[in-house]
Every structure is written in structure tokens, then in C-alpha cells.
């Protein structure tokens, strides 16, 4: 049962990466921007939930909802102040700005909450499900994380494919100029995309710290990088690709730690990404696009 236990742990970790990667893939798919501050929004969401539930003793669901609301507003503010003025700027300017926003959020967290590790109280009730006569034990937080990822992906696929606003997002991703001529509010659509991505980051932050209950101002940095890797792995711009990339990345990381080396697990994850991109540059589910000159 050890193999199955590692597999489930990998799927759970990968589900967290997938939820974060969905934020990257939606922002890139619609706005064609890489928001490297996304990982730090994860940290903000976790801190908001922690203070809401531990310090102000709000119910867990209220803490999660408050984290989502705060991060959603934060995402809109970041887009309006940092990224909107740079839509016509070179990609290097956008990347430098994203890194600057990331460091700003980390240092603001240091000022507000200090660098001391905080023990995060899980929003998921403690306990586990035993299978095969107790040979396999699955914590509730693992089940909730996997279920949350599946539900979020299904909702996003439905939203982007069936709703008016979702179709507006798809139109903007294809051609912003044509979408604007058709009466679509491009600025509002991009802001909504950042809001959704940041709300997902809050959920991912709460789930991440519920599973690994140590919270510091740099909590979201490495998961953010790995989730970006997952988005590229699966095909950035593709919602199913983000989920597939995240889950595969989580499985690879857990098995690398279990059977190869804990120290080399991150190197193995990024090495697999390089191999995939050499073989299929658009990612596993990404579309190969040829531009005519």
C-alpha cells in the first residue's frame, strides 16, 4: 500500500499546484501576461484566513471566504496599478514589474506579520478515511484538496464555455482588438481574469497550509514557481492542461522524494519539464500555433 499512499499524496500535492496553475493559465490565456506575483497572493490568502479563524475566531468557511474576497480585490488592484499601464510595453518590462510586485508583497508581509513561522490551523477537520482494513489511510485534507481541484476545473470549463463573460474571455484571448469592436469590455474582462486567478490563489494557499501547516512570508514563492512550471508543462492557456500538469508534477515530486532523493526532487521536476518542452514546446495539451508574417 506504500505505492498507493505515495500516489494519493502526489495527486493531492498536484491538485494544489493545479489550482495555482489555473490562475497563471487564465491570466496568460486572456491577458498574455505572466503574473509572477501570483505565488505571493497565495501567502496573503493564507495569512488572511489564519488571522480570521485563529485571532478573530471566525468559522473556517468564513475565513476561507474572507481570504478569497481579499485576494480577489488584491488581484484587481495589482492588475489596475501594475499591469494595465504596461499592456503595450515590452515583455521584459512586464516581467520586471511582476518581480517587483512579488517582492513588495513579501516585504509588506514581513512588516505586517514578521518573519517568524506561524502554525496554521487547518480549516479541514482532523481525521482520516481508512481503506483495505486500515492498510491505507487518507487524511480528510487530502480528500478535500483533490475534490476542490476537480470542482474548480469543472466550474471553470463550464464558465469559459457556457457563460457570456466566459465567452468574452475566450474572445479576448483570440483577438483583443476584434473583441473590443464587438462591444466587449476588454479592460473589465482582463480585470475579472485577474480577480478569478487571485481568488483561486487564496483557495490554494488555504489548502496548502492546511496540508503543510507552516506559514511564513515566502510560503507562496516555491509553490508559485512549481505551479507556473505545471502550467507550462500541461500547456499554458489550457484549463485541462493546468490540471494535468499540476497533478503530474505533484506525482513526480512525491515519487522522486520517496524513491530517489529528497534533495534532488526539485531538480528532477524541472528536468522533466525541460524534456517535455524539448519534445512538445506547447506543453502536453497546448496548441501548436504558427504565426504568419
For the regions a protein language model found, what residue spans apply to each?
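Residues that define the loop-to-transmembrane-helix transition and helix capping
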Residues: 37, 61-62, 92-93, 164, ...
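Helix-loop-helix "hairpin" substructures at the membrane interface of multi-pass membrane proteins
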Residues: 13-14, 135-215, 239-245
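Transmembrane helix-bundle core of multi-pass membrane transporters
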Residues: 85-86, 91-162, 189, 255, ...
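Membrane-interfacial amphipathic/re-entrant helices at transmembrane-helix boundaries
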Residues: 1-20, 48, 60-63, 89-94, ...
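Hydrophobic core segments of alpha-helical transmembrane domains in multi-pass membrane transport
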Residues: 46-50, 68-74, 99-107, 148-157, ...
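Alpha-helical transmembrane segments within multi-pass membrane transporters and channels
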Residues: 24, 57-101, 108, 244-249, ...
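Membrane-embedded helix boundary and interhelical linker motif in transport proteins
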Residues: 8, 30-77, 81, 86, ...
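Transmembrane alpha-helical segments in multi-pass inner-membrane proteins
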Residues: 17, 57-69, 191-201, 207-271
